[in-house]
Design a protein with these regions (language model features):
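Short catalytic micro-motifs in class I SAM-dependent methyltransferases
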Residues: 88-92
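Short, conserved catalytic or interaction motifs in soluble domains
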Residues: 95
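Class I (Rossmann-like) S-adenosyl-L-methionine-dependent methyltransferase catalytic domain
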Residues: 1-25, 30-77, 100, 114-191
Length: 191
């Protein structure tokens, strides 16, 4: 049986090309679902997540990886990366903080490095894109947590400076009990 939400499979050749012998750095690694895929493909992985419980689960799931319990806005535990993964982890912050985080990721990457990123879509009706208290445009308080939702223009605006989009698609993923709509983008550092 294929794993649910096997989104990284199609990107493994690119990840292999761009990792440049460095660990793949995963922002918001959760319980290690994507870290496990990366490690199984032969990559060293360094992951960070705010949840101590998620980090404990990730360590149990992928003992070969290195995990840090920290806010993704804190200083990164790696100095350089060829590949950064940020799946559903960049949408919790006010717009200026999100932009600053995208810039820090770009600075972390090698000149040929890539970011594989998934963001909540404004079409993600099952997971908070409507019916919640508004904080700002497309930014809501959902079950006690701020969540930002992106359309194509917002995704492009976030990565407009010194990034080259290799792929940008709105997708429905099979990760939870309900279908979830996300923007999946693969970006190359372009400065």
């Amino acid at each position: 049986m294929a794993p649910r939400d096997a989104w990284l499979a199609r990107w493994l050749p690119l990840i292999g090309e761009r990792a440049a012998g460095l660990p793949v750095f995963e922002l918001g690694c959760g319980g290690g679902r994507d870290s496990e895929v990366l490690a199984a493909a032969g990559h060293q992985v360094v992951g960070v997540d705010l949840s101590g419980k998620a980090i404990a689960n990730a360590r149990g799931r992928v003992p070969s990886a290195t995990f840090h319990c920290q806010d993704i806005r804190a200083p990164f535990p790696v100095e350089r990366a060829g590949v950064v993964i940020a799946s559903l982890s960049l949408h919790y912050f006010p717009w200026p903080e999100t932009e600053a985080l995208a810039d820090r990721i770009r600075q972390l990457l090698l000149p040929s490095g890539v970011l594989l990123c998934r963001l909540n879509s404004t079409n993600d009706r099952h997971f908070g894109a409507s019916g919640h208290p508004r904080i700002d445009d497309d930014y809501y308080m959902v079950d006690g947590e701020p969540k930002r939702f992106f359309d194509r223009a917002a995704t492009q605006r976030l990565f407009a400076r010194d990034w080259r989009a290799l792929s940008l698609d709105e997708r429905v993923i099979d990760r939870y009990d309900q279908p979830k709509c996300v923007w999946e983008t693969v970006l190359e550092r372009a400065d």
